């Protein structure tokens, strides 16, 4: 019987990075405070001491340089893991990620690849202003050549991260801060992967498909299995990968239920929820029994302190949308 460990999301992530560094000498890791301090959330705690400063090191506050160094290192044969402290700090790095990391394979006609992982803590959970609480997955998700991942539980966090390490192409790895230490889960202690691009069917039902990912999954699972949405025939899907997203799983579910609700913390306009609904409407219109709906964050700058509650607390609106769709 395989050995298992109890881990929360931050511990599962640290375990994955430890295994990656141990198995492959080409893996390197760096970021602001990622070395000596073990990262702002302590995801990399102890790794510099174990693997040395040549493989795990600290960087200045220079996200563009961090990403650019990673691109060059990846082209040169290393597998860099770059920690951006918060996803909102990644704006200076976008030029390097979008125009170089994502395009190297195409630009070189396959001669070079860019196996870089850019880690980005995202979303609410610490009641911090603006850049500390951004939800930017739609921006990264539309960039050809990038894979964009967002796990919601320790098992997927470890498995998806190790799959990202194996990817020959760049992966943006979003980490919901509010779930870092929200709960523990029994996961394999050994190396394993979860396929990038494959959604997870959490619950089966015949009345309504709910598609979500990342920080909203914890509350949705509790609502479906023991709360206000219990016994309502909900088919709950954890997307896990934003790009490429698993159309097949979502489409098969909507064909069965005829109803769709997409739930995300991100803003409503020009985001992932709209892409999913547009795709379903374009390709499955004849299957729909009701107009698809979405529950999202507001189209505003993330507010400070207690204001975060009004941006990211979606449960009452989820219940209202479900009742409307099931009328």
UniProtKB/Swiss-Prot annotation:
UniProt-listed Pfam families: Transket_pyr (PF02779), Transketolase_C (PF02780)
Top-level taxonomic group: Bacteria
UniProt: thiamine diphosphate binding residues: 63
GO MF annotation list: fibronectin binding; pyruvate dehydrogenase (acetyl-transferring) activity
TM regions (residue ranges): none
Signal sequence region: none
Needed cofactors: thiamine diphosphate
Catalyzed reactions: N(6)-[(R)-lipoyl]-L-lysyl-[protein] + pyruvate + H(+) = N(6)-[(R)-S(8)-acetyldihydrolipoyl]-L-lysyl-[protein] + CO2
Coiled coil: none
Biological processes per GO annotation: plasminogen activation; positive regulation of fibrinolysis
UniProt entry keywords in alphabetical sequence: Oxidoreductase, Pyruvate, Thiamine pyrophosphate
Enzyme Commission code: 1.2.4.1
GO CC annotation terms, alphabetical: attachment organelle membrane; cell surface; cytosol; external side of plasma membrane; membrane
Known partners and oligomeric status: Heterodimer of an alpha and a beta chain.
Protein task: The pyruvate dehydrogenase complex catalyzes the overall conversion of pyruvate to acetyl-CoA and CO(2). It contains multiple copies of three enzymatic components: pyruvate dehydrogenase (E1), dihydrolipoamide acetyltransferase (E2) and lipoamide dehydrogenase (E3).
Protein name per UniProt: Pyruvate dehydrogenase E1 component subunit beta
Species: Mycoplasma pneumoniae (strain ATCC 29342 / M129 / Subtype 1)
Gene behind this protein: pdhB
């Amino acid at each position: 019987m395989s050995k298992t460990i109890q881990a929360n999301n931050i511990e599962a992530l640290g375990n994955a990075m430890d295994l990656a560094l141990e198995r492959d000498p080409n893996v390197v890791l760096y970021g602001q405070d990622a070395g000596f301090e073990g990262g702002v959330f302590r995801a990399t705690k102890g790794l510099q001491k174990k693997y040395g400063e040549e493989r795990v090191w600290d960087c200045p506050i220079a996200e563009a340089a961090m990403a650019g160094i990673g691109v060059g290192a990846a082209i040169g044969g290393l597998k860099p893991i770059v920690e951006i402290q918060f996803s909102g700090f990644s704006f200076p790095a976008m030029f390097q990620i979008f125009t170089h990391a994502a395009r190297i394979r195409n630009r070189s006609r396959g001669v070079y690849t860019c196996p870089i992982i850019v880690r980005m803590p995202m979303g609410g959970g610490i009641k911090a202003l603006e850049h500390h609480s951004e939800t930017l997955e739609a921006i990264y998700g539309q960039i050809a050549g990038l894979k964009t991942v967002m796990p919601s539980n320790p098992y997927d966090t470890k498995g998806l991260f190790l799959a990202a390490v194996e990817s020959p192409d760049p992966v943006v790895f979003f980490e919901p801060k509010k779930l870092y230490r929200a709960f523990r889960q029994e996961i394999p202690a050994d190396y394993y992967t979860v396929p990038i691009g494959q959604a997870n069917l959490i619950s089966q039902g015949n009345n309504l498909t709910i598609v979500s990912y990342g920080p909203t999954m914890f509350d949705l699972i509790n609502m479906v299995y023991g709360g206000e949405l219990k016994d309502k025939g909900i088919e709950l899907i954890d997307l896990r990968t934003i790009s490429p997203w698993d159309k097949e799983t979502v489409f098969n579910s909507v064909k069965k239920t005829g109803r769709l609700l997409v739930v995300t913390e991100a803003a409503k306009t020009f985001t992932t929820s709209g892409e999913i609904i547009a795709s379903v409407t374009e390709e499955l219109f004849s299957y729909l029994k009701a107009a698809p709906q979405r529950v999202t964050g507001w189209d505003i700058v993330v507010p400070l302190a207690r204001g975060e509650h009004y941006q990211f607390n979606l449960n009452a609106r989820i219940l209202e949308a479900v009742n409307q769709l099931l009328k």
